[in-house]
Amino acid sequence: MGEPATDAWTGPMAWTGPMVVLVGAPGAGKTTVGTQLARRWGVGFRDTDADIEAALGTTVADIFLDHGEEYFRLAERRAVAAALADHRGVLALGGGAVLDAENRTLLAGHRVVYLEVGVSDAVRRVGLARDRPLLVEGPRTRLAALLRARRPLYAEVATVVIDTAGHEPDEVTDLLAAALGPLLAGGSEPDEAADAAGGSEPDEAADAAGGSEPDEAADAAGGKR
């Protein structure tokens, strides 16, 4: 396997911050694909949900249960800021991180990949969702609402959009590596990379989602995952 990170990391346009940031709904495959991509490139993988759990000594589900969503979002904001500042590998954000306007601002200028997933695929992948506090009751209905609300926000922060429908994790990893290779090498523009990856354009994704305003999306989503 090639390692497109090497030249980009040491050359005249060496990048600061994560090589790539993955966003998407629960079931999009951020952790699985991110881990595979990091292994392929020989870099570290980091997940802000795992960072929060390590810092607070408990699970995300228990944080929601014991302290509420507002408390979790504050912890998440701090985790996102810290990871964007000091991680140099592949970074995955929690599904609801884009609800926070400060997080979206922090993502500007980073290579952000939106892993797009449909409701059926997401439900199949998350199962009973015991570790996802906002999906415990009626996961299909809840996921559909989350996707409607968050798609415009994912698209807003995305450099590249990759549709995961019909693809196994290793195939998504291949698409992601192909899309990011030119960007890491300082080559094609983000929209060209998105075309190469088979993903929709961020603006098109937002239009398809109905283009709701960020505040409306946050209200409709009601939480994290």
UniProtKB/Swiss-Prot annotation:
Catalyzes the specific phosphorylation of the 3-hydroxyl group of shikimic acid using ATP as a cosubstrate. One of its GO terms (molecular function) is shikimate kinase activity. CDD domains: SK. Pfam families: SKI (PF01202). Monomer. It is an enzyme of class 2 (transferase). This is Shikimate kinase. Binds 1 Mg(2+) ion per subunit. The keyword Secreted does not apply. Keywords: Amino-acid biosynthesis, Aromatic amino acid biosynthesis, ATP-binding, Cytoplasm, Kinase, Magnesium, Metal-binding, Nucleotide-binding, Transferase. It catalyses: shikimate + ATP = 3-phosphoshikimate + ADP + H(+).
